[in-house]
Amino acid sequence: MMKNNLVSNLRKSFIDFFAKNGHQVFPSSPLILKDDPSLLFTNAGMVQFKQMFTNPNNANVNTATSSQKCLRVGGKHNDLENVGYTNRHHTFFEMLGNFSFGSYFKEGAIEFAWNFVIKELSLSKDRLYFTVYHDDQEAFDLWKKISGVSDSRIIKITTSDNFWSMGNTGPCGPCSEIFYDYGDNVKGGLPGTPEEDGARFTEIWNLVFMQYDRKLDGELCVLPKKCIDTGMGLERIAAVMQGVHDNYDISLFKALIAASKEQSGNSTNELAHRVIADHVRSAAFLIAEGLTPGNEGRNYILRRIIRRAARYVYMLKYDDALMYKVFPTLIDEESCGYMADYYPELIHAKDLIMSILKIEEENFKDTLVRALPLLEKELMNLSSGDILSGDIVFKLYDTYGFPVDITLDIIKEKGVKFDEQGFYDNMNKQKERSKLNHSIKSDQQLKEEFWVDIKERCGSTKFVGYERYDTKATVLSIVCGGDKNVEIANVGDKVSILLDITPFYAESGGQKGDVGIFNVIVRQEKELFANDNIAEVIDTKKVLDTLYIHECIIKQGSLMVGDVIFAKIDCERRRNLCANHSATHLLHYVLKSEIDSSIMQKGSLVSDEKLRFDFSYGVALTKEQLTLIEDKMYSLISGNNPVISHVCDLKDAVAGGAVALFTEKYEEHGVRVVSIKDSKELCCGTHVKYTSEIGCFKIVSEASIACGIRRIEAVTGRYAIDYFRQQEKMLNSIAESVKVPVDNVLVQIDKLDKKNQELEQKLSDVYFDMINLQGVNTEKIGNVDFLYSNLSNIPVNVMRKFINKHLTADRIILFANVVGQNVVCVVGVGNSLHCKVKAVDFVKMIGTMVKSKGGGNAQLAQINGEYVKEIDIMSNVKSKLVDILSN
């Protein structure tokens, strides 16, 4: 029997119950499944067991139990727009489940469910109702036998709600659901009645009896091995156990909502806080799995979630990003400790999650500021039941980048309908315009068709570049201009050459293609002097996955189809490529092992001169972290570790711990695994044989390239030596410039810096005197001191310094400085006045006068614009300020 109703204890109780009853415990599978392209996200507990359900004879276990992370946004199941409006909808939720693959069936499933809710959870049987599919008399009789409840508590449902199927064909079967009755003080009717959507009777557990195989013609055939799939929403059962009928009143959501209210300073608008609490949770889990906001697929769904929450933050009139401030509550041990305990990835990715939430919310705020006034203006003229023009919705989407789903959210709150036809008419017109622009096949399409013909005629290229740097080969095809087959290429011609066999690595997996030389040695069965006919290979590309295309310039003589050549790569360049590629693998390993295990590769470039590695991480690496990385790299390189590669099946590679990139597509069989000590990655690139061949390793830069994505650039070997020499040369030049020995450079620079600061302060003092001489006007508007002045020849940074120095809590300072045809305005607003007016509000006012837009925050803002002599900025601002302060 449970003693504590916290969500973490409920989950543990469920898992422990089924583990004691012979079920193997499975951890939650990821939300993003790499091997199931049919799903955007995992949306049910049974997803990771699909193969066992479709072929139970090959299942490696008979029974299983899990608590599964689920996301229902996009695709067939999409709860995004319902979140906040109902008591039970979430984007992210956990599903508790027990599963049988040919072991127990209906009786076992019903008995387990009954024992858990009655004996473990101690629910009153008088509060429980059960539904069965209308023709599933067996389930009806079993519930009656096992529970002893009256017939009236077992309800037959005729709709498809109580019949589950995996798809149009395949395994399927009737369902049975357990409902909890909250009592007659809550509105709602029994399942199957017109009032069933009320909150009184809540489904807490669904048992699916997979007993049929549906054929193409709709015929249901009995499965030889019947299976069980059950699902219990953790949040729903937590609500029951905590005595509330609203999921957002359970301890987890109460903590998140309280954090949202506290951080925003706004305890009104419960709907907004619910949405923020829900969306923080789902966004955090997606980011923890390596997803970043983007414009396509899963990445766009993450962006939609964050942006929808950002819009509700905006409704709270909170100026800063909020979600990243709420997130720490999710991993707080006292508030929502169960998340961090059961899902440690949230802790590991904490910095990344907070960084992405903050950046994405701040970026979208600009869109909200530009687009919402237009929408609000349109809605002012509409009442509940009216229809918003599809043209306006399209304009918001097309011109301002304002998501349609957020527009629909806003008008839903106003009771306004949406002119879908008008919107889609605009969309279709845009698509037609796009079609006209692309009615002719693109160059890329034509090139692909061209190479398909060549592949059918010549076959795939055999690559031998892992084992050797040179080989004899036959010229199969010569292409000029990218789309013209020729029989011969002469001196000066730039051509693409296809061989039957090649040692040249074609650019892929981030690694640049090889360069080198072709020497013709046999033509029309006659041996030739190797130096008479030479082609320089300037790049190697891969087309249609298996054609290695050598981009060449004929340097001497000619090259003909059918020639036998001696193909040799630039060995020194290849060695540098190998060193940088192996160093990239080691860098990935060191980042995960020393910095953050949740780090994921997001891209790479391996050239002969340098390597570039993009990875998911929310904050800049510190100098200490960069030094640690270099030290660990030195240890691995100097350890002379062997670099081993082998080919195996994809499932065996992943099972063996090999890192697979989510963005890459891999074959099921014949994948190549490269191992360097504890580093294992799927990789088709070339590598050193021992790590000592890498030589030295030096990071030359680390920076942000996108939201939540960092980039490291590094050099190895002789390029690292060149880098050290350049740095030494620069240091010597600096020493000469400041006229001290190299060892004293830092001391001298520090002295010069202090002197420079003294001079800057003296200059600021002079400018401050100039401001005072030019005159600062002071007026009292109510209890507010308004200081203002039209200045000349005062730099912007000095105006800002002056304002910061003299700004008090109940003071507003406005300076305007005219230079030729332009004017710069800087305004400061004391913090006690922010509830009525902010510095950025003044910038907006002035923007209409100077035909420009400015920026800043509540305390300090500035704007640069066109000086219009006829417009008195100070008088206009003063007049509007009087109006604001008098309200």
From Swiss-Prot:
SUPFAM superfamilies: Class II aaRS and biotin synthetases (SSF55681), Putative anticodon-binding domain of alanyl-tRNA synthetase (AlaRS) (SSF101353), ThrRS/AlaRS common domain (SSF55186), Translation proteins (SSF50447). Gene3D superfamilies: 2.40.30.130, 3.10.310.40, 3.30.54.20, Bira Bifunctional Protein, Domain 2 (3.30.930.10), Threonyl-trna Synthetase, Chain A, domain 2 (3.30.980.10). Its cofactor is Zn(2+). GO terms for cellular component: cytosol. Transmembrane segments: none annotated. Binds 1 zinc ion per subunit. It is an enzyme of class 6 (ligase). PROSITE patterns: AA_TRNA_LIGASE_II_ALA. Zn(2+) binds at H581, H585, C683, H687. It catalyses: tRNA(Ala) + L-alanine + ATP = L-alanyl-tRNA(Ala) + AMP + diphosphate. GO terms for biological process: alanyl-tRNA aminoacylation; negative regulation of DNA-templated transcription. It comes from the Bacteria. GO terms for molecular function: alanine-tRNA ligase activity; aminoacyl-tRNA deacylase activity; ATP binding; tRNA binding; zinc ion binding. Keywords: Aminoacyl-tRNA synthetase, ATP-binding, Cytoplasm, Ligase, Metal-binding, Nucleotide-binding, Protein biosynthesis, RNA-binding, tRNA-binding, Zinc. Catalyzes the attachment of alanine to tRNA(Ala) in a two-step reaction: alanine is first activated by ATP to form Ala-AMP and then transferred to the acceptor end of tRNA(Ala). Also edits incorrectly charged Ser-tRNA(Ala) and Gly-tRNA(Ala) via its editing domain. HAMAP family: Ala_tRNA_synth_B. Belongs to the class-II aminoacyl-tRNA synthetase family. This is Alanine--tRNA ligase.
